[in-house]
């Protein structure tokens, strides 16, 4: 369907399942980031998607997936290639090809975690970039797309 120009959507767990790695996919509860169910639908390749980030204080939770300190991630996932995308409440990402844009309420945020840009000494609070309504991101280049200023 996507290859024919169709669209898919999802919020909360419905957004998380669209990544290749399923964050919070444990059958015993949703607080376990790297659980017994790890395979997402893979509509967004090399991604791990989390939700309700700011509303539930989950800003650092995707670090548990991307760093995998307990080494629970299955070998079919290349952790080094994963990009973390955290979507807060009241916002969504609209993906077209290798780019996405943020839609929703002005106060909603999307956090993007790119382990390829981290150094060993990078503090946890600097391991993501914050995007807001109207911002765009290039998944292939792993970079924010500059948006021209709007005329007033």
Residue ranges and their predicted role:
Residues 22-152:
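C-terminal and late-domain segments of enzyme folds
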Residues 1-21:
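Catalytic nucleophile loop
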